[in-house]
Amino acid sequence: TKSNIKMKYSDIVNLRAMRPAYNIQEEGLGEWKTFIANDQFNGILNNMIKAVRNNDADNHKSVWIAGTYGTGKSHAGAVLKHLFCDSIDDIREYVEEEYRKEKYAMLRNSLLNVRSEKRLFPVNLYGQQSIAHEEDLSLQMQREIKRALRKAGIEITVKTDFDSLVEHIDEQPAIWQTLIDSNTMLSSVAPDLKKLKQLLQNGDTEVLERVRTAQRTAGIDIRLQIQNMKDWIFEVQNALKQQGVYDELLIIWDEFTEIMTSSIGGRLLVLLQEIAETMMNPENNSYFLFISHPSALLTLKEEEREKTKGRYHYVAHNMEPVSAFKIMSKKFKIVNEELYEQRKQHFYALHHELLGIFSQSSTDPAETIDNIMNLYPLH
């Protein structure tokens, strides 16, 4: 038809913008969907499904992905984040397309089944995360969890929020007296330390909010003790579950190598391990997802290294050979699905011999033909 003659390729297909390195904290919309799943990733996904399903103590543990630079481990981590944290309606199309083949039926069904029951809330941490001392760990984790909740419009206040402030008032009364004296919003409800402690012990959320505002204004951060930090995380997890949208937390720590290779890396891992072990209790459904270089564990003695691996679904993420055709086809973003499919089928009906030529040396000709056809309109 006349309209088809005037049709441009851009009417049916566009090129995706792709970056050389994947940043989980600064993703483009839908960028995660350009990931090419392979058997290695599917093994990691299967481990994660078994962990989140939480019906087998041996599998109910956090995940640690170790891969050298350029293997796509951060992108793999981002895909796991979306598959377990986005709403099931937002991932269904991707899952049913990526895992449409019969050989993936069990994986596809397992994932959708577990997602119909569970949804995790994502928290991103990256690299050293300004942690110079052990006490900074709880501060940074609490800050990032609160930031993620706030960004999602979720308000949660738990018992440890109040307890830790009361504890700090006892330890540092001078700081708190200065805070009251310099902030009328706070002093109007709590003119002295005794009154402030009493209101916090009674769980007064309005006073807590005024305290937080006063802290922000004065640039003061109260560090939680690590034991309090652990309690706080699981109180937040339980409060989140009660709200009915998310079940628990997925704390993703990319470039975790920086933590492990820091001068206090071994001690930080011990502290994180205490949290990870509590996560393994059957009543909990929160997880760490650590993403690191394999060298991250070289800071530990061999026996401790093997023990650490056993506490996680520890998986090596290597660079697997992926068909160049498949990589190239992921650059395309289909604008008009129906028209694209029509034009593609028409083109290959006319040039069917191309498919035979390029797939004859493949170990999986059917998949190679599929990948080549998805390269249309590149020819």
Indicate where each model-derived feature is located.
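Secondary-structure transition/capping motifs at alpha-helix termini
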Residues: 58, 87-91, 241-247, 275-286
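Substrate-gripping "pore-loop 1 plus following alpha2 helix"
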Residues: 264-274
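Conserved P-loop NTPase "ATPase switch" module shared by AAA+ and STAND
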Residues: 244-265
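P-loop NTPase motor core
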Residues: 32-35, 63-68, 77-192, 318-325
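Residues immediately C-terminal
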Residues: 71, 258-262, 296-297
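Long, low-complexity, polar/charged, intrinsically disordered or flexibly structured peripheral segments
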Residues: 184-233
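Walker A/P-loop-proximal flanking segment of P-loop NTPase domains
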Residues: 2-71, 77-78, 82-85, 97-101, ...
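Conserved P-loop NTPase catalytic core
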Residues: 101, 109-122, 126-135, 139, ...
